[in-house]
Amino acid sequence: MNKVILYCRPGFEKECAAEITEKATQHNAFGFARVKENSGYVVFECYQHEDAERLVKTLPFHELIFVRQMFVSGDLLRDLPPEDRITPIVGMLTGAIERAGDLRVEVPDTNESKELMKFCRKFTVPLRAALREHKILLGHEKADRPVLHVLFIAPGCCYVGYSYSNNNSPFYMGIPRLKFPSDAPSRSTLKLEEAFHVFVPADEWDERLGSGMYAVDLGACPGGWTYQLVKRSMMVYAVDNGPMAPSLMDTGQVMHHQADGFRFEPPRNNVYWLVCDMVEKPAKVTSLMSDWLIKGWCRETIFNLKLPMKKRYEEVSQNLALLRERLSENGIHAEVHAKHLYHDREEVTVHVRRFWSAVPGRRDER
């Protein structure tokens, strides 16, 4: 198995390919990316067979921006016989992996693949039974074991392989299944909800997304992101010259400041979260977020960077480098991650968590 299969949003294959090529080189793994426009996936073929498995195991998945999922695979299985599609798949996995903890039969996230989804659901049951019979898959799901992937890109054609549960997306097809809340002011609310799922571990939600916290939402109108904060019982400074949804104002948790988000300063020093989804040039937003973190006006921030039509990976990389450089120059210790979320379109979502050293009177971040 000398290939790494990477899922991405259709239309962002070039960005995904540029990213995996750069990251692989940094990990001394060399190869080339095969890209098919609007396919929703990229195939990175390694020159050395062992490098594909090593990348999937050691290249930190959470550091990848445009990649929704990744797994190591062999050659594409073509023209699977309708009377027995299972045997070639079992043969591909035999000797490559054993005692896996889960099976995902998936398709790329394209309109053309939707018809294949019905087949995948039906096919999963007999395939699972066969893999268990051959001891490739455990008799029960186990979260700390490798995950088997079968990606159908067309009827009778699939990539077969596996990923590691501690270095992959836990979601089917790499997509969190979120339901749009009927009382939310806009669909943009799903961006922030997905960001919480991706960037904040579930066992830390009570501590980092708890009730009673103070938050600031820059460019808040009509309140899609504010809604997520209010829903978690936070007090929110909503900053926007436009109107906020009356349903949010009626909660008593929202203080609406009709002001320019680039000039607003928090009226108190215990703001934990800063969120921002303003339509502005990425460099301008990055600079603003850096200022807030350097001044200690927030502890964590989630913000969106709107992408240009071309050189999108380069634009994101440049802004993240600028952000890290400014924080480092000012002695700020922080974690910085970015992801092209499922609910993002021509934008990337960035998360920064600042850590403080022990300071008298200040609760340390763990």
UniProtKB/Swiss-Prot annotation:
One of its GO terms (molecular function) is S-adenosylmethionine-dependent methyltransferase activity. The active site is at 306 (proton acceptor). It catalyses: cytidine(2498) in 23S rRNA + S-adenosyl-L-methionine = 2'-O-methylcytidine(2498) in 23S rRNA + S-adenosyl-L-homocysteine + H(+). Keywords: Cytoplasm, Methyltransferase, rRNA processing, S-adenosyl-L-methionine, Transferase. One of its GO terms (cellular component) is cytoplasm. It comes from the Bacteria. Gene3D superfamilies: 3.30.2300.20, 3.30.70.2810, Vaccinia Virus protein VP39. InterPro entries: RlmM_FDX, RlmM_THUMP-like, RNA_MeTrfase_FtsJ_dom, rRNA_MeTrfase_M, SAM-dependent_MTases_sf. GO terms for biological process: methylation; rRNA processing. It is found in: Cytoplasm. Its EC number is 2.1.1.186. S-adenosyl-L-methionine binds at residues 188, 221-224, 240, 260, 277. SUPFAM superfamilies: S-adenosyl-L-methionine-dependent methyltransferases. Monomer. Belongs to the class I-like SAM-binding methyltransferase superfamily. RNA methyltransferase RlmE family. RlmM subfamily. Catalyzes the 2'-O-methylation at nucleotide C2498 in 23S rRNA. NCBIfam families: PRK11760.1. This is Ribosomal RNA large subunit methyltransferase M. It comes from Pectobacterium atrosepticum (strain SCRI 1043 / ATCC BAA-672) (Erwinia carotovora subsp. atroseptica).
